[in-house]
Amino acid sequence: NGLDGKWVFTLHNPSVMPFLQYADKRDLREKIFKAYTNRGNNNNENDNKEVVKQLVTARLEKARLMGYEDYAAFVLEENMAKNEKNVYDLLDKIWPSALAKAKEELADINAEIKKEGGNYEAEGWDWRYYFEKAKKAKYNLDENEMRPYFELGHVREGIFYVANKLYGITFTEIKDIPKPDPDALAFECKDKDGTHLGVLYMDFFTRPGKGGGAWCGGYRSQTYKDGKRVAPVVTTVFNFSKPAEGQPALLTADETETVFHEFGHALHSLFCDVHYYGVSDVPRDFVELPSQVDEHWAVEPEVLKVYAKHYQTGEVIPQALVDKMIKSGKYGQGFATTEYLAASYLDMDYHVLKEIPADLDIEKF
């Protein structure tokens, strides 16, 4: 395509985020940021604004058919939150503190811009770039310092080690099994008594046509048939950048935490023991608990000694680097939390509507 010697950046998350974090050219950061944030919002055949309108309309109709005045009331009744007021009360309680912290972080970022002679206030495409600089200035920590200690194969050993220590379960790779991609791996999970618990797939790298982000799903849910347990087939899916041939896959600290997080979901599914899966779900707002718990094992000293080893020398990650990583880990929570809260408010505001206006403007809502 005449692009020999050039770098190609796609609008996949693992390509966009490092670019926004490290690219020095502000105009290019702006270009990729706007392209990324406006996916599905370009007034063309792939525009999703009308789809959003159709979704909220169909959901309200479904709720009415079930006897509820809006979709949020219908969904929340079966969740721990129970009602709309409890959700808004929680969001309203967190918002002021998160916003105050985000403003502090913004001040740090604008200070970094001025330090470099910039005569402008931070925009969306500046945030990650200058946030990385502010973080490095505060904690003397470069994310790339940690990557050599988080080689993907070692991280996988770490999650299996935790599961074995806590629950006595083991994971053995299965070679002769269909897989969604040649780079995906499959493992048989056995309980401490040697009985078959299930199969775990791990699909690590981004590729064309693959959904973005990371999640845990399944090809088969656990159930019972004719009195016998049908074991689950669970999948954890990630979108890490695939390394060049012959090179190791080195993860960031955040990506490492993501592996532990999704593995927590996988354990939840593998340990499942219900007769009627479709009516045996936990409340939706409980679902993240097992994964949130599991991700904390990523920085436990005993666990780090097992998996956080330099991919070339085998040296265990220095404690001083771990301490800086933990301290810096909370930096940026203001921005991250306000982003989550804003999405939560938007979600609730759509789904408490009692009527959907014919002229609903998705961009202004």
Please provide the spans of the model-predicted regions.
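Alpha-helix N-cap/helix-initiation motif
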Residues: 44, 48, 148, 152, ...
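The catalytic-center signature of Zn2+-dependent metalloproteases
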Residues: 272-294, 299
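Short, charge-rich amphipathic alpha-helices with coiled-coil/heptad character
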Residues: 22-39, 78
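Propeptide (latency) domains of metzincin metalloproteases
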Residues: 6-9, 17-22, 31, 68
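Active-site recognition of the HExxH zinc-binding catalytic motif
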Residues: 60-67, 163, 242, 247-270, ...
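Active-site-proximal, well-structured secondary-structure segments within enzyme catalytic domains
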Residues: 1-10, 53, 58, 64-239, ...
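Substrate/cofactor-recognition hotspot
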Residues: 3, 13, 42, 46
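Hydrophobic alpha-helix feature that most strongly marks membrane-spanning transmembrane helices
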Residues: 37, 241-244, 264, 268-275, ...
